[in-house]
């Protein structure tokens, strides 16, 4: 369930102020609205605990996209477990995203993730879409050469 925030809070026995920790977690959840997983998602994830995922498709997409982008001259952080790629923007990340749109490339500015100067590109799509996108990435790279 990529993107879902599922987890739990463990409070060691050594914590003397157990109730304050619970209160702080509850306040954070009410204020921020996304700290603790909603009950519905907790129930849904319990049905998925024994499920497996074939990560070979993600790996093939990762390799294809990473290899092509680095060949075109982009500097990328090679993912080791994510379904997205961080690419160093050739200019301000928001301007770079706007330039990518001219070639129908959808990227997210890294500043949205407190990582300015980079863009995030998801590769959890059909392999054919990655293949079809490569000429556009090549044209984008040529704009900065």
What positions do the PLM features span?
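PLP-dependent class I/II
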Residues: 1-145
């Amino acid at each position: 369930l990529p993107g879902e925030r599922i987890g739990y809070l463990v409070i060691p026995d050594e914590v003397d102020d157990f109730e304050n920790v619970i209160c702080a977690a509850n306040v954070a959840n009410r204020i921020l609205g996304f700290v603790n997983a909603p009950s519905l998602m907790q129930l849904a994830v319990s049905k998925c605990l024994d499920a497996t995922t074939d990560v070979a498709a993600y790996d093939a997409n990762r390799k294809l996209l990473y290899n092509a982008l680095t060949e075109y001259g982009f500097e990328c952080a090679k993912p080791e477990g994510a379904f997205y790629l961080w690419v160093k923007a050739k200019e301000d990340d928001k301007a770079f995203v706007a330039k990518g749109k001219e070639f129908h490339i959808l990227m997210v500015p890294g500043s949205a993730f407190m990582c300015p100067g980079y863009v995030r590109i998801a590769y959890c799509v059909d392999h054919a879409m990655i293949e079809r996108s490569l000429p556009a990435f090549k044209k984008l790279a040529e704009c900065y050469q």
